[in-house]
C-alpha cells in the first residue's frame, strides 16, 4: 500500500541552499524512496524572491519526481507551515558588511520568533524542525521559545555539516574511507568554536585517535580547519557553502526520521543538563536515533582538553542567548 504524503516546509526556498536541497528531498533522499512528499516553500514577500521561487517550482515540476505529490509557494509562515510534518528553516538574515553581531542576532530573532509562533499555531503537533540558517543554535532556541505548545525536543539545529567536515579531514589524515568512521561527534555551537571530538571514533573497531596519535595536529590543524572551513569556502568560492550544507540537512533529517541504526550522529538539541550543559541550551551532542526520536549518548569521559573546548563553545552560546533574551 502506498504511503500517505507528508508535508515538508522549507524556508529560504529560492536561495542557494534551498536550490541544492529541494530536488534531493523530492527524489526521496531524505525520507525514503517510498515516501511521497508535499513541498510547502516559503520565501520573503519580495517580488524578486517570489519570482525566483516560481522558477525553482517550474524546475521541480520538470523533474517529474514520482514522489512529489504537491508543491506550494508561500510568502507567509502561517500558511507555509500549515500541518507540516517536517520544517527545514534555511532562510536567515546573513551578516552584511559592517554589521555588528548584536544586529545580526536581533534581525534573526525577529525572523525566528515569527516562524516559531507560526509553527506553534499551525504545524503538526509532531513537527520535526531543523534550523539551518545561522546562527543556527540560537535561531533554533528562539523558534523553540516562541512555540510553547510544541515539545522543545522537536527543535534542532544543524551540526551535521561540522560532523561531516570533521569526518572528511580525519579520513584524509588517517587514510581511512570516510564512511568507515564511527563514533565521531561535534560538541557545542555551529560556529568556529565547535569541538569536533574523535577520542571515541573507530574505523573497523580500531581507535582513530590511536591511529593518528598526534595531539598537536588535533589542536593546531584539525580543529581550526574544521572550525574555519565555512570561511575558507567563502574565500575560495565567493559564496557560502550551499551544496554541502544541503547535504548535511538531508543527512540530519534522514537519520532523525528513519533512524541511525545504532550509529552516533551529531545534532544540536535542547539540553536536559547532560554533560553539565544548562537545560534548554541548544547544543551539539552525540546522539543515536530510532523511531523518529533522538537520544543523547551519555556517560562519555570528558578529559581536561575536551572540557576546555566544551566550556568555550558553551560560553559563546550563552553570550548569544543573553543577546536575544530581551527580544523573546
Swiss-Prot record:
Active site per UniProt: 190 (proton acceptor)
Enzyme class (EC, first level): oxidoreductase
Functional note: Catalyzes the reversible oxidation of malate to oxaloacetate.
Binding-site residues for substrate, renumbered to this chain: 95, 101, 134, 165
UniProt entry tagged with the keyword Oxidoreductase: yes
PANTHER family named among the record's database cross-references: MALATE DEHYDROGENASE
Catalytic reaction annotation: (S)-malate + NAD(+) = oxaloacetate + NADH + H(+)
Gene3D superfamilies, A to Z: Lactate dehydrogenase/glycoside hydrolase, family 4, C-terminal (3.90.110.10), NAD(P)-binding Rossmann-like Domain (3.40.50.720)
Homology family: Belongs to the LDH/MDH superfamily. MDH type 2 family.
GO biological process terms, semicolon-separated: malate metabolic process; tricarboxylic acid cycle
GO molecular-function term, one example from the UniProt record: L-malate dehydrogenase (NAD+) activity
UniProt cross-references to CDD domains, sorted A to Z: MDH_chloroplast-like
Residue sites binding NAD(+) per the record: 12-18, 108, 115, 132-134
InterPro entries: L-lactate/malate_DH, Lactate/malate_DH_C, Lactate/malate_DH_N, Lactate_DH/Glyco_Ohase_4_C, Malate_DH_type2, NAD(P)-bd_dom_sf
E.C. numbers: 1.1.1.37
Protein name: Malate dehydrogenase
Keywords: NAD, Oxidoreductase, Tricarboxylic acid cycle
Amino acid at each position: 500500500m502506498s504511503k500517505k504524503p507528508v508535508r515538508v516546509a522549507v524556508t529560504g526556498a529560492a536561495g542557494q541552499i534551498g536550490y541544492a536541497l529541494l530536488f534531493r528531498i523530492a527524489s526521496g533522499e531524505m525520507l525514503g524512496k517510498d515516501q511521497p512528499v508535499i513541498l510547502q516553500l516559503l520565501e520573503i514577500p519580495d517580488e524578486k524572491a517570489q519570482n525566483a521561487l516560481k522558477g525553482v517550482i517550474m524546475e521541480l515540476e520538470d523533474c517529474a519526481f514520482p514522489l512529489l505529490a504537491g508543491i506550494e509557494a508561500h510568502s507567509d509562515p502561517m500558511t507555509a507551515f500549515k500541518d507540516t510534518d517536517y520544517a527545514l528553516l534555511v532562510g536567515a538574515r546573513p551578516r552584511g558588511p559592517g554589521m555588528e553581531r548584536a544586529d545580526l542576532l536581533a534581525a534573526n530573532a525577529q525572523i525566528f520568533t515569527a516562524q516559531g509562533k507560526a509553527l506553534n499555531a499551525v504545524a503538526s503537533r509532531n513537527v520535526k524542525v531543523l534550523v539551518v540558517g545561522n546562527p543556527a543554535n540560537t535561531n533554533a532556541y528562539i523558534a523553540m521559545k516562541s512555540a510553547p505548545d510544541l515539545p522543545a525536543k522537536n527543535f534542532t539545529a544543524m551540526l551535521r555539516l561540522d560532523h561531516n567536515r570533521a569526518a572528511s579531514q580525519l579520513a584524509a589524515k588517517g587514510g581511512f574511507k570516510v564512511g568507515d568512521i564511527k563514533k565521531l561527534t561535534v560538541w557545542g555551537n555551529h560556529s568556529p568554536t565547535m569541538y569536533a571530538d574523535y577520542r571515541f571514533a573507530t574505523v573497523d573497531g580500531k581507535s582513530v585517535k590511536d591511529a593518528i596519535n598526534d595531539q598537536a595536529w588535533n589542536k593546531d590543524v584539525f580543529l581550526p580547519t574544521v572550525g574555519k572551513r565555512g570561511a575558507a569556502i567563502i574565500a575560495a568560492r565567493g559564496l557560502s557553502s550551499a551544496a554541502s550544507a544541503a547535504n548535511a540537512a538531508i543527512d540530519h533529517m534522514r537519520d532523525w526520521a528513519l533512524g541511525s541504526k545504532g550509529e552516533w550522529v551529531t545534532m544540536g538539541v535542547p539540553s536536559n543538563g547532560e554533560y553539565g550543559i544548562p537545560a534548554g541550551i541548544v547544543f551539539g551532542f552525540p546522539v543515536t536515533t530510532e523511531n523518529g526520536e533522538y537520544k543523547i549518548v551519555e556517560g562519555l569521559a570528558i578529559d581536561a582538553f575536551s572540557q576546555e573546548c566544551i566550556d568555550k563553545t558553551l560560553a559563546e552560546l550563552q553570550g548569544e542567548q543573553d543577546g536575544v533574551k530581551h527580544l523573546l
